[in-house]
């Protein structure tokens, strides 16, 4: 059982823009939702979780088999935690007149071979190594229930988060972005908007590499499919790309890592099996060794940021 911790604050807020006029009606504009938890003894920099594809922020709160999610690991380590529901996801319902068209919801036949049980299929060479999905027979069903619509283009997803970026950073202050999968391009775009408010980026199996041709868009702007709305260089800060042993993202992540490394940044490509953490697929925050992965990420942040992420008093964090 994990040690308890004390919170000094928790809450949530919709990040709203100007109302949108479409189809002869007035609708809420592009909006996101951010939930936060602040431990009693907090580090000076927070962590912002950015979910992937058709997911939602709840995947960082609990695993599909009911264990504490990554949010709890980072809170126990003293980080204020912010969890984003990107526009059109989670608590921010998709509205086609505002968000544009959405892809059909993915079914079991598409997601199970890629996320839940790749070892039962032969879609990529490393799939047979996967053995970290929870044993709970309903874990896959709970994961499927969390999946919602997503934009038909990566550029649209990027523009959606850029629309809420100013309100987001005004609320949360200095932060470390922890993005996942198709939320990876959104994380780079947020860093370009946030500038020096983004201390570091931890990209968990981020989608894309320069020039990659994807059904949702070609990566023509570094690691994004569209030019950044912000002026900052998203890679001008410590960056880590994290890859599991049994995922289809290994080659793409290696190409993305080579690009970031060539920029001369403070960078590490964290291949989990090289740290004694093996058998993982794409949903690193959901699998049975998720807590060990979170500890590895915390250690990387501490090494990379040093005093900028120092812990004020370890005794005050634990309850």
Predicted segment positions?
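N-terminal cap/lid segment of alpha/beta-hydrolase-fold proteins
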Residues: 1-42
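Short, surface-exposed "cap/lid" segments of acyl-processing enzymes
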Residues: 41-129
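Glycine-rich His-Gly loop
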Residues: 49-55, 181, 206, 244-245
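Conserved acidic catalytic loop of the alpha/beta-hydrolase fold
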Residues: 134, 148, 155-176
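Conserved alpha/beta-hydrolase fold motif
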Residues: 177-178, 201
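Gly/Ala-rich beta-loop-alpha elbow adjacent to hydrolase catalytic centers
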Residues: 178-187
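The feature captures the conserved acid-bearing segment of alpha/beta-hydrolase catalytic domains
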Residues: 206-271
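Catalytic active-site module of serine/aspartate enzymes centered on a nucleophile-bearing elbow/loop
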Residues: 277-279, 283-319
């Amino acid at each position: 059982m994990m040690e308890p911790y004390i919170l000094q604050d928790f809450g949530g807020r919709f990040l709203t823009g100007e109302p949108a006029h479409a189809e002869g009606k007035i609708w809420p504009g592009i909006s996101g939702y951010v939930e936060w938890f602040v431990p009693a003894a907090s580090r000076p920099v927070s962590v912002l979780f950015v979910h992937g594809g058709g997911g939602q922020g709840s995947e960082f709160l609990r695993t599909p088999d009911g264990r504490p999610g990554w949010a709890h690991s980072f809170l126990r380590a003293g980080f204020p935690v912010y969890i984003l529901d990107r526009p059109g996801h989670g608590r921010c319902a998709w509205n086609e007149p505002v968000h544009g068209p959405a892809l059909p919801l993915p079914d079991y036949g598409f997601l199970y071979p890629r996320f839940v049980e790749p070892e039962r299929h032969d879609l990529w060479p490393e799939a047979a190594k996967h053995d970290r999905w929870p044993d709970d027979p309903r874990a896959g069903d709970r994961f499927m229930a969390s999946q919602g619509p997503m934009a038909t283009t990566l550029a649209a997803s990027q523009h959606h988060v850029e629309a809420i970026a100013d309100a987001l950073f005004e609320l949360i202050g200095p932060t470390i972005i922890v993005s996942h999968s198709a939320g990876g391009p959104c994380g780079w775009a947020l860093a370009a908007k946030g500038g020096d408010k983004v201390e570091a980026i931890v990209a968990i199996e981020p989608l894309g590499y320069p020039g990659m041709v994807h059904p949702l868009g070609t990566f023509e702007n570094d690691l994004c499919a569209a030019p950044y709305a912000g002026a900052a260089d998203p890679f001008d800060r410590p960056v880590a790309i994290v890859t599991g042993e049994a995922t289809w993202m290994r080659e793409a992540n290696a190409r993305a890592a080579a690009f970031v490394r060539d920029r001369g940044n403070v960078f590490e490509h964290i291949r989990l099996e090289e740290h004694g953490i093996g058998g993982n697929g794409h949903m690193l925050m959901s699998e049975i060794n998720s807590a060990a992965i979170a500890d590895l990420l915390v250690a990387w942040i501490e090494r990379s940021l040093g005093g900028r992420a120092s812990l004020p008093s370890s005794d005050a964090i634990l309850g």
